[in-house]
Curated annotation (Swiss-Prot):
Species annotation: Mus musculus
Protein name stated in the entry: Tether containing UBX domain for GLUT4
Region described as Interaction with GLUT4: 313-376
Gene3D superfamilies in the cross-refs: Phosphatidylinositol 3-kinase Catalytic Subunit, Chain A, domain 1
GO cellular component, one term: endoplasmic reticulum-Golgi intermediate compartment membrane
Length: 550
């Protein structure tokens, strides 16, 4: 009996008809037919007379291990084949795709090698005769067959092609060094594969390896070859030559790194210009230099985070405006008919749908972490670097100013006090609805929900006639002018929705705290002079509306 599989990788256990179990190591690119052939070769059976069965399912032997949907250490069983695989079922239709996009198609036997298939077509045969220092490569799915020796020893059946149709990509690439190819060959050999019987010289010039992606990329193969070359050097394998060592040591010496107090990498200079010239092999050799694996960058401690520079003060741009100074677009209707206030079935349905959507949003809201909430807050702060605040006085005058989100409620009080006619007046600020007095002067405007724009009410313990200074009241503007100033001064991030529309006198509605229509007269409702009577439709028996007319 074969020895059990050890080490890394996947393995499969096959039960032979004689009652013996054989363990086969597999890779993601191993074809199930190779597992069957390896077991039959060990137990002296004919592979064409048996199939592999997993539980109650007979497996498709043309599938690779990654597509067979089998667990690791799966227990397979050899069962007699229901129909012989000899005969017309072994005919496979192959299409070779060339570099120019053209395809060469024909039917072949599954026992034929890839070299015989390439020699069958005149176009590919001419390319094989004019190779020179180049190497022919055939790519099927994630398997790559490189070199003449591998093409002559790889059959369609070894690739899992025992019937149907398939497309194989044929390319000509430059020859790599023998050391790189040898390292790739050592990594790419799979147990039980048909290329395992090749000699060391043949393996150095031809390889059969699985690709990491479905797309053929020469750069990826070179990078993997460099990484494996450096990895084998640690185990006593072929070491780089003296010329390569001198070249790798001379490159960093020519551009010394000069640190600076800011941390990070220096921009510009000789080090930045020579950085793209560093070979991937040098990077891979550095990653394997430590005994414990590649080194990880150190994470800064919470106490060592760089302190942010204080933000420059923002221009307040104080402006006073009055809602009565705005010219109405249309005259208000003299009287609204009673039908306008009637609650119809459509109104109830619309309101019910809104309540359902709001309840669903609150119930299905995901639980977020503290770090996620802080990231959202930081994103909001970066999107709106300024805060537009408007203070509504009892005499309907509105004072507008700009602040930073990090400024406090105390700064807002100082701003209001500096524009009062009587600076000694005792007052308080609050937001509504619901009424909430801003008595904590240490809260930032962001923490007080005055972000990115809000309307704050002014309250005084001793009411007076005029609150603002007379010099400021002489320059009172219209609400539309104040809105234009907000749209001009508040810088927004690119792609974010506009905070305040310039021509529209409607006040800020970006936050729930801001009152609708409090900062300017609302637009008249279109068509209220001649209301359209809405049909009640069919009213359910359980719905009773006191104001509805039937």
């Amino acid at each position: 009996m074969a020895a059990p599989a050890g080490g890394g990788g996947s393995a499969v256990s096959v039960l032979a008809p004689n009652g013996r179990r054989h363990t086969v190591k597999v890779t993601p690119s191993t074809v199930l037919l190779q597992v069957l052939e390896d077991t039959c070769r060990r137990q002296d059976f004919n592979p064409s007379e048996y199939d592999l069965k997993f539980q109650r399912t007979v497996l498709d032997l043309s599938l690779q291990w990654r597509f067979a949907n089998l667990p690791n250490n799966a227990k397979l069983e050899m069962v007699p084949v229901s129909r012989s695989r000899e005969g017309p079922e072994n005919i496979v239709r192959i299409a070779f795709q060339l570099d120019d996009g053209s395809r060469l198609q024909d039917a072949f036997c599954s026992r034929q090698t890839l070299w015989e298939l390439l020699s069958h077509f005149a176009q590919t045969r001419e390319r094989l005769q004019q190779l020179g220092e180049k190497t022919p490569v055939c790519v099927y799915m994630r398997n790559e067959v490189t070199g003449r020796a591998a093409l002559q020893n790889t059959t369609l059946q070894s690739l899992g092609l025992t019937g149907g149709s398939a497309t194989i990509r044929f390319v000509i690439k430059q020859c790599d060094t023998a050391g790189k190819q040898e390292s790739i060959a050592v990594r790419s050999k799979a147990p039980g594969s048909p290329v395992s019987s090749l000699s060391a010289d043949q393996a150095s010039s031809s390889t059969l390896l699985p690709l990491n992606s479905g797309e053929f990329s020469r750069g990826d193969l070179n990078h993997e070859g460099d990484a494996n070359t450096s990895g084998t050097g640690l185990e006593g394998g072929p070491k780089p030559t003296d010329a390569q060592t001198k070249q790798s040591t001379s490159e960093p010496a020519s551009a010394p790194f000069v640190p600076f107090s800011g941390g990070g990498q220096r921009l510009g200079g000789p080090s930045a210009s020579l950085r793209p010239l560093t070979s991937p092999s040098a990077n891979s050799s550095k990653s394997f230099s430590g005994p414990g694996g590649p080194s990880k960058p150190k994470k800064p401690k919470p106490g060592e985070e760089p302190q942010q520079e204080p933000e420059p003060p923002v221009d307040r741009d104080p402006v006073v405006y009055h809602p009565d100074l705005e010219d109405l677009l249309q005259p208000w209707p003299a009287e609204v008919p009673d039908e306008f206030f009637e609650v119809t079935v459509d109104d109830v349905r619309r309101r019910l749908a809104q309540l359902k959507s709001e309840r669903k949003r609150l119930e299905e809201a995901p639980l977020v972490t503290k770090a996620f909430r802080e990231a959202q807050m930081k994103e909001k702060l970066e999107r709106y670097p300024k805060v537009a605040l408007r203070v509504l006085f009892p005499d309907r005058y509105i004072l507008q100013g700009f602040f930073r989100p990090s400024e406090t409620v105390g700064d807002l009080r100082d701003f209001v006090r500096s524009h009062l006619g009587n600076p000694e007046l005792s007052f308080y600020l609050f937001i509504a609805p619901p009424k909430m007095v801003l008595d904590d002067h240490t809260l930032t405007l962001f923490q007080a929900n005055l972000f990115p724009a809000a309307l704050v009410h002014f309250g005084a313990e001793e009411p007076t006639g005029l609150y603002l200074e007379p010099g400021l009241l002489e320059h009172t503007v219209s609400p539309s002018t104040a809105d234009v100033l907000v749209a001009r001064c508040m810088s927004r991030a690119s792609g974010s929705p506009p905070l305040l529309p310039a021509p529209d006198p409607v006040s800020l509605e970006s936050e729930p705290i801001a009152e609708d229509g409090a900062l300017g007269p609302p637009e008249p409702i279109q068509g209220t002079a001649q209301p359209v009577k809405r049909s009640l439709g069919k009213v359910p028996k359980w719905l009773k509306l006191p104001a509805s007319k039937r």
